[in-house]
């Protein structure tokens, strides 16, 4: 049927009027602390630190999340020796986006229900929810 996958849903205000689990509060507090440290960056700037940031981003974001969590573990796009699979997965853990099994199961569930009301990081809940808010909610990510 034409346009059968179009949904009309109302935002559920997942951030307001809810009880936050202790793990959610701890994660949010930690993220606020880390981002608060960034306020010191203009006063402590150095080019070696920019280089360290770029290397850290490559290790955690590119190798850990994109290559390991997403391509290797979620989609099984390629295989590596177990020692390398574990090393790459550890790089993903350093990105502070959760444990590999948790991230992979959430991502696979997302692909089962992409852009529907059942999507754990649905765009129907808004830009911030679909990009990062779902990470702050233990009920959605587990």
Spans of features found by a protein language model:
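Non-catalytic, topology-defining segments of multipass membrane proteins
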Residues: 1-142
